[in-house]
Amino acid sequence: MLDVFRKPNGPNYTWATDWASQLLALTRGEVLHRVDGSFFNAPATPRESIEAQIYGKSLFGPGTPIYVGTQNFCTLGVAGYDEAGNTIGVTAGHCGAIGDEVYSADSWENGVTGTVVAKSAPTGTGAQGAFGDVAIIKFDDTKAAVTRTYNGVTVAGLGTTPQGLEGLGTNLCKMGVATGLTCGPRMYSTPQLTMAHVCSMQGDSGAPLLAGDRLVGIVSGGVTDLAPCRSPLQGPLFVPVLATTTDSIFAQLDAAEAGTPGRGFRLPDADEPRLR
């Protein structure tokens, strides 16, 4: 019986059943490959994205895979609205340049649905490179819908809390197109930067870093380019991930001039998207 909510092969979307793919992904049956060099069973396009396409929309939320410009494949950290009512997304700054067109890799058939309108570039490599590694995307309201829950990942709050979610050793999780949902302990933290032993690789840039259902960071990359997390067979043998803290991102946006895209960012309502 045809499953209308199972997308067939397409751009960065290849199903495999060979024994090597199953072994490297530690997955029986079909394995989805989405990023070159990743042997994980990648996150499949979720039902809610396909339903949004029925209404002519691309759906964006935490963990949505995105194309930025002509070459970059990244992950969206969060989507919502700014104080001017613009529909906004946040990803890693190194994913693209101002003016780059953006579209969802889960609904690539819909074409361009947003544009990078602001960014702060990385200032170096490794830990230095994560500072300010943020890009702001403005979506076309006629083509895009946003949600706080996407593919099983929910962002219900922004930034750290008095309850101590920001403490060292706190379990943090990220959702990226290359390696999916992976978790590990926070290892180091400053007001601008968080380092955690969480599996990630190229393609996961921009992904949400979560403490429970609170967004605490936007993934920038690994501490070094050595030993990225390419297969679950690696176990804990991969470099830690660096993320720009949500607190620093939104503090910077809120301090910007009125009218700056992203200023006064808020999450979508819990019942969004309202497609009908």
For each predicted feature, which ranges?
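Protease-domain processing segments flanking chymotrypsin-fold serine proteases, especially trypsin-like
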Residues: 1-87, 100-115, 267-276
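Polar low-complexity intrinsically disordered regions enriched in Ser/Thr and small residues
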Residues: 13, 32, 40, 59, ...
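Serine endopeptidase catalytic core focused on the charge-relay Asp
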Residues: 68-190, 211-212, 275
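A short local loop/turn or secondary-structure capping micro-motif enriched for an aromatic residue
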Residues: 97-100, 204-205, 224-227
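C-terminal cap/linker of serine protease catalytic domains
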Residues: 112-116, 123-126, 139-157, 221-276
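FAD-site-proximal beta/loop scaffold in flavoenzymes
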Residues: 195
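Catalytic nucleophile loop of clan PA
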Residues: 199-219, 223
